[in-house]
């Protein structure tokens, strides 16, 4: 695989549902956030953020740099404490049982997190063993490496891998041990088109089996029936929202919605 990123892949592909707001979910989701607040460096990044994920759902986090996409993923993973709000699994706070929440989700951050002195297969066995609490079956490791085209590099030290190969090794973790929820931060960075297609297929299989996925990306990733979540709509008030609302009021109804109404309807 050629792991150089195509120059044309510089913007996220709009999810199929990106042009429409998600209908209100009254059935209760498996994984939900209610009124989430993120504070970073003493600054409120977002507030009042809600989301709901059910079996087979995909959520795409959208927004400019600094809007809190990576922070929200870390909150979802239990790695960052929210400044407010609730994170629930089947209606129960994930903070009540953080070990169970860790076991049910895979978080792949924008850093690869590899042990460069270990071989490719040793890296995958190490991380998978941590999750499973025991040495993983060799066949599981081989299958994950084969899926991402790394089987021929199994005995190579991780430090010798290209940027794209390192990213593929990080992503292979989600296949080497089962988890209901995948949290992926810029998963397509440094990947060529063939590798992105492999990732898309893996996500599609995961969803067909009832899994859920949340993705933050600036790259084109084809995700069928994915819900968009625009994080800049949950930024703390700086006067812009009020200006938009005043402008909408001045224009009258005429098909225009207030900023507040648009924000509420945009919540998944």
Task: Label each region the model flagged.
Residues 157-164:
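Conserved ABC ATPase signature
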Residues 77:
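Helix-to-loop junction immediately C-terminal to a conserved catalytic motif
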Residues 182-186:
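Catalytic Walker B motif of ABC-type/P-loop ATPase nucleotide-binding domains
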Residues 111, 116-132:
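Q-loop/switch helix immediately C-terminal to the Walker
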Residues 125, 138-153:
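Conserved ABC ATPase "signature" region
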Residues 85-96, 100-101:
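Conserved ABC transporter NBD signature motif
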Residues 171, 210:
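Hydrophobic anchor residue at the start of the ABC signature
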